[in-house]
Amino acid sequence: MAKTLNSRIPEGPVAEKWTNYKAHQRLVNPKNKLKLDVIVVGTGLAGASAAASLGEMGFNILNFCIQDSPRRAHSIAAQGGINAAKNYQNDGDSVYRLFYDTVKGGDYRAREANVYRLAEVSNDIIDQCVAQGVPFAREYGGMLANRSFGGAQVSRTFYAKGQTGQQLLLGAYSSLSCLLYTSDAADD
């Protein structure tokens, strides 16, 4: 008999699932954060970003690389860019439009609650990447440049000149190394 994976997506309307879930979650006392060790397996874009974010929140992070070098992550192959609903060009972009385009682009096979949550936090992800030093392409006025990509209704793809994946990994690694040096200095 095959086992079914339980994705544990919260109940309720799609637009409110994760908001309601976060509102009813138990919080970790700030004093207890240093007592918790969080194990992150993988140093690709997801693993490195998760480790950097959790480290910035004050958790002890144990990050394991399953390859011979962290820089061998396949995330380095991503070139197109990242979609976010920032509405820079005043073209009516919204979280719902990004959600719809993403679900449609995935042939309606994606978990809608997770895609909606990703659309909600897409602006924060771009802002975090900029704070980590990712050199996104910019317009002459200094605003982040974006383009239409992959059949989207509006221009919402933020990119780093054909090496978006590599630059995102370098940004995440630089955040990790800052945390590493800070914790090493605190241990001395």
Locations of the language-model features?
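Extreme N-terminal leader/targeting segments of oxidoreductases
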Residues: 1-37
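Glycine-rich active-site loop/strand segments that organize a redox cofactor
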Residues: 84-117
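Glycine-rich FAD pyrophosphate-binding loop
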Residues: 57-76
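N-terminal Rossmann-like FAD-binding beta1-loop-alpha1 element of flavoenzymes
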Residues: 38-63
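Terminal amphipathic helices with adjacent charged low-complexity linkers/tails
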Residues: 138-161, 165
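A short alpha-helix-loop-beta-strand transition element characteristic
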Residues: 109-114, 126-142
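Short beta-strand to alpha-helix junction loop
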Residues: 115-120, 158-173
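Conserved small/polar residues in nucleotide/adenosyl-binding loops
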Residues: 181-186
